[in-house]
C-alpha cells in the first residue's frame, strides 16, 4: 500500500474533515491535559481531504522526529499509549433522507461483525447486517452478508450526510461509501 505523507491530498474527498477536539463542552473525551501532562488542543487531522497531522505521544513523536500532539493516554501498569479525545468527522451537505434517495441499489450497514482489515494491503472485508436500499428506498432487512473493498478506495469514495450527533468519544455522521462489494444471500 502507499505511504501516507503529511500534507498530501487525495486521501479523502475534498469535503472531508476529521477533528480531534479535547475542548468540547461536556464531551466524553474532554480534558485539559493528556496522559503525560501535555496541554491538549483542537487538531484538524484531515481537512479538505488532506492529512494534516498524526496523533502522537512523546514516545511516538520522538521515533518520527516530530513533536508530541498531546495525545498520550494512560492505563494501569503500562507505558503511555496514544489515543484521541473527542474524535469526529464533520457534517457533509446532504441530509440523511437525500443521501438514501440518491442510492439506486445499496446496503445500509447497521451492524459490523468481526475484524477484517489487512493493515499491509489496506484490504477490508467484514460481515454485516442491515437494510437493502433499492431505488432510493430502504426495502427490507438483510443479514449474513459480507462487505469488502480497500481502505484507499473507501476513503476516496466516502461522503458524509449532515446528521452528526455527539454520543461517544468517536462520532461521525452517516457515511456513504460508493463501489464496495456486497456478497451474501
Identify what each model region corresponds to.
Residues 2-185:
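Dual-mode signal for accessory low-complexity, basic/Gly-rich regions
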Amino acid at each position: 500500500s502507499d505511504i501516507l505523507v503529511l500534507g498530501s491530498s487525495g486521501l479523502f474527498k475534498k469535503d472531508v474533515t476529521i477533528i480531534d477536539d479535547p475542548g468540547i463542552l461536556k464531551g466524553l473525551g474532554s480534558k485539559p491535559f493528556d496522559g503525560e501532562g501535555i496541554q491538549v488542543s483542537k487538531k484538524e487531522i484531515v481537512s479538505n481531504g488532506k492529512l494534516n497531522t498524526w496523533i502522537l505521544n512523546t514516545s511516538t513523536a520522538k521515533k518520527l522526529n516530530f513533536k508530541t500532539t498531546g495525545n498520550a493516554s494512560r492505563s494501569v501498569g503500562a507505558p503511555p499509549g496514544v489515543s484521541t479525545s473527542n474524535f469526529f468527522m464533520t457534517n457533509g451537505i446532504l441530509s440523511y433522507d437525500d443521501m438514501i434517495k440518491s442510492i439506486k441499489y445499496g446496503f445500509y450497514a447497521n451492524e459490523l461483525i468481526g475484524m477484517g482489515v489487512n493493515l499491509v494491503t489496506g484490504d477490508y472485508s467484514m460481515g454485516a447486517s442491515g437494510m437493502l436500499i433499492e431505488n432510493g428506498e430502504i426495502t427490507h432487512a438483510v443479514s449474513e452478508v459480507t462487505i469488502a473493498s480497500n481502505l484507499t478506495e473507501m476513503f476516496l469514495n466516502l461522503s458524509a450526510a449532515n446528521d452528526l450527533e455527539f454520543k461517544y468519544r468517536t462520532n461521525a455522521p452517516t457515511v456513504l461509501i460508493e463501489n464496495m462489494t456486497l456478497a451474501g444471500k
